Amino acid sequence: MAVYRLCVTTGSYLKAGTLDNIYATLVGTCGESPKQKLDRVGRDFASGSVQKYKVRCEAELGEILLLRLHKERFAFFCKDPWYCSRICVTAPDGSAVHFPCYQWIDGYCTVELRPGTARTICQDSLPLLLDHRKRELQARQECYRWKIFAPGFPRMVDVSSFQEMESDKKFALTKTVPCAEQDDNSGNRYLPGFPMKIDIPSLLHMEPNIRYSATKTASLIFNALPASFGMKIRGLLDRKGSWKRLDDIRNIFWCHKTFTSEYVTEHWCEDSFFGYQYLNGVNPVMLHCLSSLPSKLPVTNDMVAPLLGPGTCLQTELERGHIFLADYWILAEAPVHCINGLQQYVTAPLCLLWLNPQGVLLPLAIQLSQTPGPESPIFLPTDCELDWLLAKTWVRNSEFLVHENNTHFLCTHLLCEAFSMATLRQLPLCHPVYKLLLPHTRYTLQVNTIARATLLNPDGLVDKVTSIGRQGLIYLMSTGLAHFTYTDFCLPDSIRARGVLTIPNYHYRDDGLKIWAAIERFVSEIVSYYYPSDASVQQDCELQAWVGEIFAQAFLGRESSGFPSRLCTPGELVKYLTAIIFNCSAQHAAVNSGQHDFGAWMPNAPSSMRQPPPQTKGDTTMKSYLDTLPEVNTTCRNLLLFWLVSQEPKDQRPLGTYPDEHFTEEAPRQSIAAFQNCLAQISKDIRERNQSLALPYAYLDPPLIENSVSI
């Protein structure tokens, strides 16, 4: 008689335990054990519990290949899900085999687990294990299916595929959702207290293993409801018309101020702060260094000489690499939208900036269209104060549109969703790349589904607050993806290509490159352990299918993007994985976390403009300026969104935090520890630097970076 000892750990999530019966079967090279119930005196499989059981066999099973968990009904109780963290099996000879699980087991089913040792398909030769890989991927591909949201968009998860699964896989709360109004058959409706329609059905059927935890869901709701109801009670969400005074905007979130939001309120109209935001604001990727001026921006030396001062000229500064351009060409053909029944307006400005001898980036000239001419004057710092302020505000509106739609949602949320989907569909649990990337996909499918249900749906928040609306968003993102390249995706390459390596006080660049290097070193150690040669990469058909699916579904097979459709060397794999992890974590933090800080003062980030751009100088008054800014209710709706997305809900996992131990070998565990130590040193350096800054830059402080796109 051979006795195997099982140590079963149940997750500590709310309702992670189960009353259902759990049975186990061990499968080894010499046979398999009888199906045996895991039962002991008292409650089994309670949340957070660690319990030990015995499985008896007539003879030893040899090397353990699989552990089957069978979940079946207990008496008359209703079925409930069980979150199994991990199981350790100790053989009669004392050797231990670890089985990571870290998933919800829902309904009555059988789940097969492999030992925690990561293996590529080339390292498996047993038909049993090869068949297990194949069946696992077939099941996942049936569950996680691709869907087209709009032409030219990265493909997204098809939530309806979860609805088609058996009823015990659904999260059915339809009858518990209080709906104030439903005026169509799509499920697009208003909820009490929320200022936009929500696509309810798409939120109710998330597969358990990609759904927010109860803690995160509760935290998100508790962040949203008080702010939304507070505005509703004060009548702000229903108040149309212009702001009477700029100072009135201060009172929207009087209890939700931050040091940075207060700093922005005090300094937003200063030219130096306008330039600072191109380096360390929420969209720090727009600047390109110029060696000559584009013909569409006919700025002359006489125009800017008063700012440049004696001893230099525009041509000299161009040759020195001190002139930069922010070009919003992508907005030139963007459709416009109506808000509160009124036509809104969009411009495609060109903003020329100069790095002065003191290392301060200053705006030199602004043209509010892509076509120069008498009706498109070039605004200068020497113009009257309100004319110059209005021109800068138009640029800030363009910044808002490009940042929110492309830099933020397209390049982090949507692309990271495609990475998550391909990882789930093409890599089995035992694959080393799956183990590496899984923590960086956490909650991404859920948060993007929420975004599509609340922001991108018809009459959702995008239609309520932005000058381009939902149709403009679709245009902007599809155009942005058509021009997005692998160089843009890889931070070091992007920095070099944009010519911004030497700008001082560019904290996003400095902190980002440090984090990139730390991730690259960590990934390199993992890859070298599992892929010792070029052939090991080229012959991994699962890895190649994963890369190919990302190329086809995220980048629509566009060769000009420069994204690989196949990987040939470990070095190429390291760069690709580094870029994915960086963009799922650090890049998202850089472009997301500061939205409330920099947008709470609405004139610094207006979501829409209500008057056409000026065609002459000298006509701007404070009244006309206020009449150009968004209306009161539009402002409040947008600031509510800024507040929510800047407040990371509970259940956070900072970059480098891996509580789920998917890697069980010693080498990758040591690499994880070294990665964490490196991030700790980066954090220490950032905090020391910030002590001497008037406005600290903390968005890339590793403890403040979430592992994944989860909000």
From Swiss-Prot:
SUPFAM superfamilies: Lipase/lipooxygenase domain (PLAT/LH2 domain) (SSF49723), Lipoxigenase (SSF48484)
Binding site for Fe cation: 408, 413, 588, 592, 711
EC number: 4.2.1.152, 5.4.4.7
Cofactor: record remark: Binds 1 Fe cation per subunit.
Catalytic reaction(s) noted: a hydroperoxyeicosatetraenoate = a hydroxy-epoxy-eicosatetraenoate; (8S)-hydroperoxy-(5Z,9E,11Z,14Z)-eicosatetraenoate = (10R)-hydroxy-(8S,9S)-epoxy-(5Z,11Z,14Z)-eicosatrienoate; (12R)-hydroperoxy-(5Z,8Z,10E,14Z)-eicosatetraenoate = (8R)-hydroxy-(11R,12R)-epoxy-(5Z,9E,14Z)-eicosatrienoate; (12S)-hydroperoxy-(5Z,8Z,10E,14Z)-eicosatetraenoate = (8R)-hydroxy-(11S,12S)-epoxy-(5Z,9E,14Z)-eicosatrienoate
Residue ranges occupied by any Lipoxygenase domain in the UniProt entry: 120-711
Record keyword Metal-binding present: yes
Subcellular location field: Cytoplasm
Signal peptide (UniProt feature, chain positions): none
GO biological process, alphabetically ordered: arachidonate metabolic process; ceramide biosynthetic process; establishment of skin barrier; fat cell differentiation; hepoxilin biosynthetic process; linoleic acid metabolic process; lipid oxidation; lipoxygenase pathway
Tissue distribution of the protein: Skin specific.
PROSITE patterns (alphabetical): LIPOXYGENASE_1, LIPOXYGENASE_2, LIPOXYGENASE_3, PLAT
GO cellular component: cytoplasm; membrane
Effect of inactivating the gene: Mice die within 5 to 12 hours after birth due to defective skin barrier function loosing around 2.5% of body weight per hour. Dehydratation through the skin is increased 4 folds. The outside-in barrier acquisition is also affected, the skin remaining permeable at 18.5 dpc while it is impermeable in wild-type mice. The stratum corneum is more tightly packed while other layers are unaffected. Hyperkeratosis of the skin is observed but it is not associated with defects in epidermal differentiation while the ceramide composition of the epidermis is altered with an absence of ester-bound ceramides.
Record bears the keyword Metal-binding: yes
Domain PLAT: 2-119
Gene Ontology molecular function terms on file: hydroperoxy icosatetraenoate dehydratase activity; hydroperoxy icosatetraenoate isomerase activity; intramolecular hydroxytransferase activity; iron ion binding; oxidoreductase activity, acting on single donors with incorporation of molecular oxygen, incorporation of two atoms of oxygen
Name of a matching Pfam family: PLAT
Record key words, sorted: Cytoplasm, Dioxygenase, Fatty acid metabolism, Iron, Isomerase, Lipid metabolism, Lyase, Metal-binding, Oxidoreductase
Pathway named in the protein's UniProt entry: Lipid metabolism; hydroperoxy eicosatetraenoic acid biosynthesis; Lipid metabolism; sphingolipid metabolism
Source domain of life: Eukaryota
Cofactor(s) needed by this chain: Fe cation
Family: Belongs to the lipoxygenase family.
Function per UniProt: Non-heme iron-containing lipoxygenase which is atypical in that it displays a prominent hydroperoxide isomerase activity and a reduced lipoxygenases activity. The hydroperoxide isomerase activity catalyzes the isomerization of hydroperoxides, derived from arachidonic and linoleic acid by ALOX12B, into hepoxilin-type epoxyalcohols and ketones. In presence of oxygen, oxygenates polyunsaturated fatty acids, including arachidonic acid, to produce fatty acid hydroperoxides.
Name the record gives this protein: Hydroperoxide isomerase ALOXE3
Native source organism of the sequence: Mus musculus
Lineage: Eukaryota, Metazoa, Chordata, Craniata, Vertebrata
